[in-house]
Regions:
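Structural boundary micro-motifs
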Residues: 1-110
């Protein structure tokens, strides 16, 4: 069985992407069922968002500007999970970092 806790890592930054509010609510319910708190608060009591960080302590939290920069721009040491695909049992739930083909060579997640 797939769990959120399986991604707790001491070496990588772990981010879960939510495509919509319903996906985020499902994530919060699953996290709470696994005993994961949102910095001491039950996740289902928090506002939904598009990206959630899983901390090495096993807690989850919102992502600020620095975390968003890391999510979008860091190539190594970052795990990005599409929670919608993960929760549906899809095998391709990891979001890969790819360099854009644009002229400015800015990174692009696909």
């Amino acid at each position: 069985m797939r769990t959120i806790k399986q991604f707790i890592s001491k070496t990588n930054k772990v981010y879960f992407f939510m495509k919509d509010e319903a996906t985020c609510r499902r994530f919060y319910q699953a996290a709470e069922a696994e005993g994961i708190s949102f910095c001491g608060t039950p996740p289902t009591q928090k506002e939904t968002t598009d990206i959630i960080a899983l901390l090495p302590s096993g807690e989850i939290c919102y992502v600020g500007w620095a975390g968003r920069m890391c999510y979008h721009n860091c190539k190594k040491g970052v795990v990005r999970i599409d929670y919608g695909k993960f929760s549906e049992g899809c095998g391709n739930y990891l979001i890969k970092w790819k360099k854009s083909n644009l002229s400015n060579n800015s990174p692009k997640l696909q």
